[in-house]
Amino acid sequence: MVFRIASSPYTHNQRQTSRIMLLVLLAAVPGIAAQLWFFGWGTLVQILLASVSALLAEALVLKLRKQSVAATLKDNSALLTGLLLAVSIPPLAPWWMVVLGTVFAVIIAKQLYGGLGQNPFNPAMIGYVVLLISFPVQMTSWLPPHEIAVNIPGFIDAIQVIFSGHTASGGDMNTLRLGIDGISQATPLDTFKTSVRAGHSVEQIMQYPIYSGILAGVGWQWVNLAWLAGGVWLLWQKAIRWHIPLSFLVTLALCATLGWLFSPETLAAPQIHLLSGATMLGAFFILTDPVTASTTNRGRLIFGALAGLLVWMIRSFGGYPDGVAFAVLLANITVPLIDYYTRPRVYGHRKG
């Protein structure tokens, strides 16, 4: 059987592409603001580094390929790739990591396939996974939200840690990651997985400061709600379609609910899955990438549901605390197959 992506390349109108990318960038403002509020200025520094790296990397490749640099950069796709990677990594990760991940995403995962519209995998998630596999410690060193943090780095401190590894007063990531309980903090998903494996009960885990939020992990619930708000705005602007976010979130919630009902002592409750990690960012800003997602309505529902199932399985049974990036890439692999079996039948066509 030969699989074909019938509508590739997906982006034919550069002005339309530029407008959609700009809408996505604007929709990201609430999520970025929430991450800045809870995790400090490091997020902004990472966004600036990633944006500059993405534009320079794209310009370099276009120059080598003798293509128009200015016209292509105006589509804002490189900028969006850098932004999505920057908000996915810890805010005080070393500067060279975000540069390396962004350059890899733009050059290897996008331009080597032929540029926008030709890449089969989401470039930002390729860059993220490369960094996660290569530097797992740095990529899981998140700061505690400011509500439970002992040391809150300012703008200058954030720059110093990102570029030198420590603040002017000698503080490093180990001291900055301390929570009010004197324990180095991780994300709610990472904390849950580590604690369950250590033999702690769910009742004990829920007493940790990181779970003192109203619905889920402190800070993270509001970050996810902010990304949700941006995603709803994208739907209202008709920049994305509802099929993928809805099927992804419904499937994730359903799997999490069933798992929690059958094994409440080892699996996280559905609200933790929905409002922790990169759930809403993935649902509305990453999975909906028109280049790497399914192109039919039925296909989008299947694609989103598959990603939701994979996220829950990786979070619950895998070796990584948050499975959004891996789920996105694994779902990307299935897109030609999904599109092949869900493409509309041509009028008058009969199976011979």
UniProtKB/Swiss-Prot annotation:
The modification FMN phosphoryl threonine is found at T187. It comes from the Bacteria. It is a multi-pass membrane protein. GO terms for cellular component: plasma membrane. Part of a membrane-bound complex that couples electron transfer with translocation of ions across the membrane. Required to maintain the reduced state of SoxR. Belongs to the NqrB/RnfD family. The complex is composed of six subunits: RsxA, RsxB, RsxC, RsxD, RsxE and RsxG. This is Ion-translocating oxidoreductase complex subunit D.
